[in-house]
Structures are given as structure tokens and as C-alpha cells.
Amino acid sequence: MQECMGSAGFEKREIVNIFDDPIFEGCVDGEIIEMARVRMTTIPEPTGCVPHKVVYSDIDYNGHCNSCRYLQTMTDAYLPDYYGKKVRLDINYSKEAMLGETLQTYYLIVPDGVQYQQKNGQGETSCSAKITIL
């Protein structure tokens, strides 16, 4: 079995560049663009808000909302027109959402894309994201 990313990143729980792994040789289409990290901020005055109740099909085997579903519910709330364009997605998972919880998806349309923030019933941020059109 091939060892992925040298396991050093996993043992130390550090950020690693996955494209340094030999498994990705020949898989990257075009150049890799180095980008600075994006700081997630609270949305002071959202453009809109859409509720989503976490249902059975949203949860994973741990009983938490599946990580892909956060992004799906965000883009269901508002999807920027980025078809055929390069985009950058920054996402920050803060607190797990559980079966039966209702998440409020706040979104803010910004000049270069859209910023999202999902909050649970206690007002805690579960997930935040930004889609930037490059």
C-alpha cells in the first residue's frame, strides 16, 4: 500500500501541500497558483438568509452533517455565476451540525464572489466559506 503524504503531516497535525505527494504527478491541469490564506469574518449585514434543517441524508457515519453538505446548502442559498471560470473556495468548519438542527445560511454578495456563514440555533457559526471568482 502506498504511503500518502509521507504521514509526517498526519502525525504532527500540520498543514501540508498535497501536491507535493508523488501520487499527484501528472494529475494537475495547468499551473498551481499560490494564494494567501483568507480570514473568515462575520457577515455584518447579509444580502440574504436561507434556513436548512439537517435531515438524515445530510449526516455521515459519525452522526454529524457531512462536510460536503455544508457547501451544497450554501450554494443552494445563493450560487454566483462562475460557470466556466476559475474559482477559489475557502471553507472553515467550526462546529458540527447534528441531525434535526436548523442552520441559517447567511450570504453576502461581494464584488469578486460571495461569502457564506452558517449558524446553528444557538447563534454559533458551524461553517463559513468564500467563493472567489479569479
Question: What is each stretch, according to the model?
Answer:
Residues M1-T42, A97-G100, L108-L134:
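HotDog/MaoC-like acyl-thioester-processing domains
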Residues G9-V87:
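Hot-dog-fold acyl-thioester-processing enzymes
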Residues D90:
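Short aromatic/hydrophobic contact patches that present stacked aromatics
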